[in-house]
From Swiss-Prot:
HTH lacI-type domain: residues covered: 6-63
Protein name: Sucrose operon repressor
UniProt cross-references to NCBIfam families, sorted A to Z: fruct_sucro_rep
Source organism, top-level taxon: Bacteria
Pfam families hit by this protein: LacI (PF00356), Peripla_BP_4 (PF13407)
Organism whose genome encodes this protein: Klebsiella pneumoniae
Leader peptide range in chain numbering: none
Keywords noted in UniProt: DNA-binding, Repressor, Transcription, Transcription regulation
Job description of the protein: Repressor for the scr operon. Binds D-fructose as an inducer.
GO biological process, one term: response to fructose
DNA-binding residues: 8-27
Protein's UniProt keywords contain Translocase: no
Recorded GO MF terms: DNA-binding transcription factor activity; transcription cis-regulatory region binding
Amino acid sequence: MKTKRVTIKDIAELAGVSKATASLVLNGRGKELRVAQETRERVLAIAREQHYQPSIHARSLRDNRSHTIGLVVPEITNYGFAVFSHELETLCREAGVQLLISCTDENPGQESVVVNNMIARQVDGLIVASCMHSDADYQKLSEQLPVVLFDRSPSDSALPLVMTDSVTPTAELISRIAPQHADEFWFLGGQPRLSPSRDRLAGFTQGLAQAGITLRPEWVINGNYHPSSGYEMFAALCARLGRPPKALFTAACGLLEGVLRYMSQHHLLDSNIHLASFDDHYLYDSLSLRIDTVQQDNRQLAWHCYDLLSQLIDGQAPEPLQRYLPATLQIRHP
């Protein structure tokens, strides 16, 4: 049986007041416009009893906003993006804003489709971890809709941006480990066209240099950020060497997931490999295999994205427009 939605008119009739009076009370303006306290309390009590919910559409028409924002990420199963999405959704919920999430699977064509779908749903703004080669489409879009980029940045973009400084903490981590492995230290990365891949390789190279070690080109192996790519790259490396590598840095926890799966399947978890990675995971504390990591602050990333976008939606000029956040090291080796 179809249920009937409770309306302001229904509340007004039950409370014995006009629809206009009920509307004022339910919209929080009753006291301001001198509706009697007894009347306000009666209207609100009936609204609670009837489980009245205000119409989002009416609210949107009233203030010309949808009170929704869109989040576009490459994949929601990625641990970092999943934690970021959770933190952002919490901020939105507390502010009375609905968060819509879409995934691109690192496909620029699919990214265009999901962004257009968000626009069609009249979101008030977008937060995007883009896989596009340039920001040209977002530059044009930003003229009519607030857009904040996060996690990665097309080259020389002037758009609002929030991301972790990958270079500095990666260099610090590698400079600590490298002196013990001067003859061999491997890097497994994602797509080189993405700024996080370039930044983390730059930090890796810088960390080696700080330890007095020159990067050998053959130490760098790139694929994509899916766990299957980490598995395949590590399998090929072990086959090439005839043994596990002595030291390895993965540019994301997804890649490390693939490495650990291969190691588990081939009984290598007790080997002497020194593992390090960008991105931390709480499960690493439970492993007998020690893993040193660079830990991003997803709560701060989400807060700064929401802060930037909220100010842009309100027509303000936030400062700074581009924000690079620090990361911390999680050292598990003695």
